[in-house]
Amino acid sequence: MASTDPYTPPPLPSPFTNTTPPPQLLTQGAEAHLYKTVFLSPSAPAALKVRPSKPYRHPILDRRLTRQRILQEARCLVKLVREGVNVPAVLALDWEGQSGEKGFGGAWLMMEWIEGMVVRVVLERWEKYMKRNQAGLGAEEFEKEEARVRDLMKRIGHAVGALHKAGVIHGDLTTSNLILRPPTRAEQQPAADETNPSMEGDVVLIDFGLASQSLQDEDRAVDLYVLERAFGSTHPRTEPLFTEVLSGYKESYKGASSALKRLEEVRMRGRKRSMIG
């Protein structure tokens, strides 16, 4: 019989145990927990990513892996910020043993809080809006709607291109790891799903837990392939417009054409694996 006990997250690192207001748990994954907290001032929101220790691993190996992974993520973010790519800025980080903290056994990374809506939600809301209203839209209105989403797709391509130009591979490119940051706070999206969402603003890449540094076309192509598959499984209505993502990507840096050529090979391998099962 399944347990009905509420989930209890692991203890917070000591710097955050008495924070006011307390950190708010947003998501929990196999490797990390994401909280919303504040940095230095109650009016300055921040994202806190906590990597708890893994009791099933040898303690020495666990500490080494946790430290390596949090540092790898932070280094990628710092490099991208320096290159002008839209990603959260690193505010602070620590791991067990660095500050003498005992009992926590993990690592944490505090980052700039990115206001906005996840691109997955934006596209899902737009698809629902179009499904409900398509019959009532005239040809001109339909073209305007499609032009809006094409522009967003191209901006996604520009964002991924800027990432790869800087020599960083995301490792988990999905629309859940892209945030559409509105130009002003006044343009925050309403909560109702019935609305037609705004698509204005910058595309910000988040969640670099699987990121690495590489200039290899193969790695770039796999990154793009993961994003393409994400569109196919999550956004069937906008999947045919994925060519706009690739168009924006091609415009973003000189070596993009080589990565796109390699993408064709990655697609072929993916199709063969699907056929074999």
UniProtKB/Swiss-Prot annotation:
Its EC number is 3.6.-.-, 2.7.11.1. It catalyses: L-seryl-[protein] + ATP = O-phospho-L-seryl-[protein] + ADP + H(+); L-threonyl-[protein] + ATP = O-phospho-L-threonyl-[protein] + ADP + H(+). The active site is at D172. GO terms for biological process: tRNA processing; tRNA threonylcarbamoyladenosine metabolic process. Residues 20-277 form the Protein kinase domain. ATP binds at L26, T27, Q28, G29, A30, E31, A32, H33, L34, K49. SMART domains: S_TKc. It is found in: Cytoplasm; Nucleus; Chromosome, Telomere. It comes from the Eukaryota. Residues 1-24 are annotated as: Disordered. One of its GO terms (cellular component) is chromosome, telomeric region. Belongs to the protein kinase superfamily. BUD32 family. Component of the EKC/KEOPS complex composed of at least bud32, cgi121, gon7, kae1 and pcc1; the whole complex dimerizes. This protein is considered an atypical serine/threonine kinase, because it lacks the conventional structural elements necessary for the substrate recognition as well as a lysine residue that in all other serine/threonine kinases participates in the catalytic event. BUD32 has protein kinase activity in vitro, but in the context of the EKC/KEOPS complex, the catalytic subunit KAE1 switches the activity of BUD32 from kinase into ATPase. Component of the EKC/KEOPS complex that is required for the formation of a threonylcarbamoyl group on adenosine at position 37 (t(6)A37) in tRNAs that read codons beginning with adenine. The complex is probably involved in the transfer of the threonylcarbamoyl moiety of threonylcarbamoyl-AMP (TC-AMP) to the N6 group of A37. BUD32 has ATPase activity in the context of the EKC/KEOPS complex and likely plays a supporting role to the catalytic subunit KAE1. The EKC/KEOPS complex also promotes both telomere uncapping and telomere elongation. PANTHER family: EKC_KEOPS COMPLEX SUBUNIT TP53RK, NON-SPECIFIC SERINE/THREONINE PROTEIN KINASE. This is EKC/KEOPS complex subunit bud32. The lineage of its organism: Eukaryota, Fungi, Dikarya, Ascomycota, Pezizomycotina.
